[in-house]
Amino acid sequence: MSSGLRAADFPRWKRHIAEELRRRDRLQRQAFEEIILQYTKLLEKSDLHSVLTQKLQAEKHDMPNRHEISPGHDGAWNDSQLQEMAQLRIKHQEELTELHKKRGELAQLVIDLNNQMQQKDKEIQMNEAKISEYLQTISDLETNCLDLRTKLQDLEVANQTLKDEYDALQITFTALEEKLRKTTEENQELVTRWMAEKAQEANRLNAENEKDSRRRQARLQKELAEAAKEPLPVEQDDDIEVIVDETSDHTEETSPVRAVSRAATKRLSQPAGGLLDSITNIFGRRSVSSIPVPQDIMDTHPASGKDVRVPTTASYVFDAHDGEVNAVQFSPGSRLLATGGMDRRVKLWEAFGDKCEFKGSLSGSNAGITSIEFDSAGAYLLAASNDFASRIWTVDDYRLRHTLTGHSGKVLSAKFLLDNARIVSGSHDRTLKLWDLRSKVCIKTVFAGSSCNDIVCTEQCVMSGHFDKKIRFWDIRSESVVREMELLGKITALDLNPERTELLSCSRDDLLKVIDLRTNAVKQTFSAPGFKCGSDWTRVVFSPDGSYVAAGSAEGSLYVWSVLTGKVEKVLSKQHSSSINAVAWAPSGLHVVSVDKGSRAVLWAQP
C-alpha cells in the first residue's frame, strides 16, 4: 500500500488486516525483546572475557620467559604471588568454563529462536498467500455479486414484461372467448335457420314435385282414356292382362289400360324420393345406406370358398407415391387398391390381371397418411393422418365427406366398426376415440396410458396394440379395459382372421403371434432368421381364409408363414430396396401387395 494514502481511503477489510499485523508484531516483539537484550549483553560479556582470556594467556606465556631471564631475582616472584596467580588462573578458568557453558546455552537459544523465526516467517508467508487468495476470492465474489444483481434486474424486467404480456393475453383470451361464445350462438342460430329454410325448400320442392306428378298423372290418364277408346288387336297368347268391358257385346276385345296404368304408377312413385336424395347429396349428407353398392363387391364369396394362393413372383412393380408409403388396403371386392403415403395423399388403383392402373387421388390431408380402411360395402374409405385427424372419402366420386379432429397427437390407426356408422381411432396422444358418423361427433374418449399403434374391432370389442408392449381389449359399451395381454416387444400391428376368433400381432421383438380370443392364449408364434420388424407401425395381415400370415421385413423381403405348421411358407425378395411398411392380401386370395419406406409398391401373385 502507498504511504500517501490515508487510512480512510482503504476498505474496511484492508484496515482490519493492517491492524491485525501490527498487533501481532507488538505481541511477538514484546515476548522476545528481553531475551534479545540479554543475549546481546551476554555476547558483549563473552567478547570481554575472550579479550581478558587472551590477555591472561599472553601474560602466562610471558611470565616463564621473564623467569628464565632473571631466575635469581628474588623480589619479582615469590610464593604468595605464585599462589595468587594460580588462584586467579583457576578462577578465570572457572569463569571461562561458565562463559562457554552460557555461550552454548545462548547459541542453542539462538538456534531455537531462529527456528521459531523461520516457522513464523513461513506462517507469515502462508497467511499472506491466504490473504491474497481471500482477496482474490472476495474480488471474484464481488464480481459475481455484481453479475447476479445485473441478472436479477434483467429477470425482474423480463418477469414484469411476461406478466404484462400474460395480462394482455388474458384480456385477449377473455375477449376471444366471449367472441367465440357469441359466434357459436350465432352459428347455432344460423344452422337452425338454415335447417328450417332447407326444410321449407324441401317441402316446397316436394309440393312442386307432387303437383307436377299429379299433372303428369292426369295427362297420362287422359291419354290412356283416349287410347282405350281405340280397339287394339290382341293375340291369344299375349300375357297382357285383359279387362272385359261389360257394356260391349264383343267379349274378345281387350284394352291395356290396367297394365299400362300399373307401370305408370310405379314410375310416378319414384321422382320424389330421387329428388330428395339429390338435394341431400348436394350438401354431402348421404347416409351409409344411401350409397349404392359398388360393382366390385357383387362377386364376393365367403372366406371358405376363396382360392387363396401363396404368391411366388412379383407380377407388377410401380412407384405408388412421392416418398414413403405407409399403408395399403384392398377393397372388399379386390378390384380397388388404396395406398397412403407421406405425400399426404390416398391413391386408388384398379387391380386387374397382373397390373395396377391408377384411378384417382383422394386429397385433403395436411400430413402423411398412416392407416387406410374400407367400409364393408367398399363405398367409403377411412384414412388416419399425422395431422391429428382422420378423414372419410366416398370412393365413387373421390369427395371428402368427413374430417374427424380432436386428437392432440398423430393418429396412427382408424377403423370402421361392423355397423359402418361408428369409427374408432387410436393416437400417439395415448387416447382412443369413438366417433358417430350420424351425429358427426366424438361420443367417447378413453385414455389408454400408452401410444396406440394399431386397432382392430369385433362387434362388441375393440383391440388396440400399444407402445408399452400391451394389447388391450376394450368393451365398446363402457370405457373400461376388459383384459390386457403383455408381449415382449412394442406392438406394431394387429389383424383378425375371417372368423374373428384369432388375433394376429406383430411386435418389435421380431415375433408374430396368433392369439386365440376364446382362450386368451398364444396359439402360434412365427419367426425367421432373416425377419426383422422395420418400424413401430409395420403392418401384418392374415390371408382371406386365415391359413397364412404375411409380413414385411426391414431388409425388404416379404415373409409368408403357414398358420397350421408355424413354418415359413415363402420368402419373396429382390424387389424392395428398403424396409417394408405394410402388406395387404386381396379378399379374392389371388394377390398380395407390399409397400416400403421408399416409394415402391409390389403386386405379388402366383402364375
Curated annotation (Swiss-Prot):
One of its GO terms (molecular function) is GTPase binding. WD repeats lie at residues 320-359, 364-403, 406-445, 447-484, 486-525, 532-573, 575-607. It is found in: Cytoplasm; Preautophagosomal structure membrane; Endosome membrane; Lysosome membrane. Keywords: Autophagy, Coiled coil, Cytoplasm, Endosome, Lysosome, Membrane, Phosphoprotein, Protein transport, Repeat, Transport, WD repeat. The lineage of its organism: Eukaryota, Metazoa, Chordata, Craniata, Vertebrata. Pfam families: ATG16 (PF08614), WD40 (PF00400). The gene is Atg16l1. Homodimer. Homooligomer. Heterooligomer with ATG16L2. Interacts with WIPI1. Interacts with WIPI2. Interacts with RB1CC1; the interaction is required for ULK1 complex-dependent autophagy. Interacts with ATG5. Part of the minor complex composed of 4 sets of ATG12-ATG5 and ATG16L1 (400 kDa); this complex interacts with ATG3 leading to disruption of ATG7 interaction and promotion of ATG8-like proteins lipidation. Part of the major complex composed of 8 sets of ATG12-ATG5 and ATG16L1 (800 kDa). Residues 207-230 are annotated as: WIPI2-binding. Plays an essential role in both canonical and non-canonical autophagy: interacts with ATG12-ATG5 to mediate the lipidation to ATG8 family proteins (MAP1LC3A, MAP1LC3B, MAP1LC3C, GABARAPL1, GABARAPL2 and GABARAP). Acts as a molecular hub, coordinating autophagy pathways via distinct domains that support either canonical or non-canonical signaling. During canonical autophagy, interacts with ATG12-ATG5 to mediate the conjugation of phosphatidylethanolamine (PE) to ATG8 proteins, to produce a membrane-bound activated form of ATG8. It comes from the Eukaryota. Residues 230-242 are annotated as: RB1CC1-binding. GO terms for biological process: autophagosome assembly; axonal transport; corpus callosum development; defense response to virus; dendrite arborization; hippocampus development; macroautophagy; microautophagy. The keyword NADP does not apply. Widely expressed. Expressed in the testis and sperm midpiece (at protein level). Gene3D superfamilies: 1.20.5.170, YVTN repeat-like/Quinoprotein amine dehydrogenase. Belongs to the WD repeat ATG16 family. Residues 13-43 are annotated as: Interaction with ATG5. It is a peripheral membrane protein. The WD repeats are required for non-canonical autophagy but not for canonical autophagy. The WD repeats are required for the recruitment of LRRK2 to stressed lysosomes. This is Autophagy-related protein 16-1. Changing T300A: No effect on the stability of the protein under normal conditions. Enhances cleavage and degradation mediated by activated CASP3 and CASP7. Results in reduced autophagy and defective clearance of intestinal pathogens. GO terms for cellular component: Atg12-Atg5-Atg16 complex; autophagosome; autophagosome membrane; axon; axoneme; cytoplasm; cytosol; endolysosome membrane. InterPro entries: ATG16 (IPR045160), Autophagy-rel_prot_16_dom (IPR013923), G-protein_beta_WD-40_rep (IPR020472), WD40/YVTN_repeat-like_dom_sf (IPR015943), WD40_repeat_CS (IPR019775), WD40_repeat_dom_sf (IPR036322), WD40_rpt (IPR001680).
